[in-house]
Regions:
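N-terminal helix-turn-helix
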Residues: 2-110, 114, 275, 279, ...
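Short, solvent-exposed recognition segments
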Residues: 2-14, 18, 154-229
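Amphipathic alpha-helical regulatory segments at dimerization interfaces
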Residues: 50, 66, 116-127, 133, ...
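Amphipathic alpha-helical effector-binding/dimerization core
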Residues: 98-190
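Juxtadomain coupling helices with adjacent low-complexity linkers
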Residues: 206, 217, 229-231, 245-307
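Short hydrophobic beta-strand micro-motif common in sensory/regulatory domains
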Residues: 232-236
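Sensor-regulatory modules in signal-transduction proteins
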Residues: 238-241
Length: 307
């Protein structure tokens, strides 16, 4: 049985290669901590990770049963999260707390990638009459951090904060194609069935070969209907200053008579926008945009003033 993608935050620590470069399961890098050495901080975040759209409220007893810790330990962790504002009591249950709303607002206003991307995404939406998404890689999750949407596009809204399938769709495939080989091998060991089901290959060599083709091409176009009926997507990678993959610029369009041939799609505009975003983010990382720092400080002063 394959492990669920959303719970695979430590996959890369348990695979490696032998001297002949063959895939070996169960090997940990020497720099990794022992499997049993789980810190209290990790366990606190294990509690926070229980909360989802499927189950937004948890009692102490439910969390204790799910995490298999003592009730007193789980209660102590919940109390810590409540004190930090990350959880809040709802009757005898607990849900996400107001501090998360505050942090989300802070990210919307100050996230460097989001700030440089918003004008370009809005321009692309108007030019292409399409939904434009800014996707961010987070461990083994890919999350929408901004969406430019218009109901006239005919594409359902995705929504900020929504995660996408890790092995399906243009976004996931273009991001996977730029992950380090070691991480891809770990993913394959743990998700071979899901990878085959997504059409990415029924062997490690096939999986690696398919992703190599995407990487060489520099973009990926999904099949119509792969994730949404009548919709196809174009995704181009976004990189940090050291050329590590951090996410993608993704465009969703309804078919409505459009061809899925790459020479008839707005690839040039999407690739240019993604390239510009990578350059802008690299400039921010290298400290070349001091004006953004000044703007953030000004914004902080404004937000600190009472209403």
């Amino acid at each position: 049985m394959t492990a669920p993608v959303g719970a695979a935050s430590s996959l890369s620590a348990y695979s490696g290669e032998n001297r002949r470069g063959r895939l070996v399961e169960g090997r940990r890098a020497s720099s990794d901590r022992p499997f049993t050495a789980i810190s209290s901080l990790d366990r606190v975040f294990d509690v926070l990770n229980l909360f989802s759209l499927a189950k937004p409220l948890w009692t102490v007893d439910e969390a204790t049963a799910a995490l298999k810790h003592s009730r007193s330990t789980v209660y102590r962790y919940i109390r810590t999260l409540v004190k930090a504002g990350l959880l809040a009591s709802v009757g005898r249950s607990y849900g996400l707390g107001p501090r998360i709303v505050e942090l989300d607002q802070q990210m919307r206003l100050t996230d460097p990638l989001l700030r440089v991307a918003q004008p370009q995404l809005a321009q692309l939406r108007r030019r292409l009459n399409a939904v434009v998404l800014l996707m961010r890689l987070f461990h083994n999750r890919i999350i929408c951090i901004h969406e430019e949407w218009d109901e006239r596009t005919g594409v359902p809204a995705a929504g900020r904060g929504r995660a996408v399938a890790f092995f399906r769709g243009a976004t996931s495939k273009v991001i996977l194609a730029h992950l380090p080989t070691r991480r891809l091998k770990s993913l394959y060991l743990n998700h071979a069935r899901d990878i085959a089901k997504a059409g990415l290959g029924d062997s490690w060599n096939a999986f690696a070969g398919n992703l190599r083709d995407v990487r060489r091409r520099g973009y990926h176009i999904s099949e119509v209907g792969e994730l949404m009926t009548g919709v196809f997507s174009i995704a181009v990678p976004i990189f940090s200053g050291d050329r590590k993959i951090i996410g993608s610029l993704t465009v969703l369009q309804c078919t409505s008579g459009k061809s899925s041939r790459s020479d008839e799609l707005p690839l040039a505009a999407v690739r240019k926008a993604a390239g510009d975003l990578s350059k802008a983010y690299a400039a921010i990382e290298s400290g070349l945009t001091s004006d953004m720092k000044l703007a953030s400080q000004k914004l902080a002063r404004q937000l600190a003033q009472p209403l």
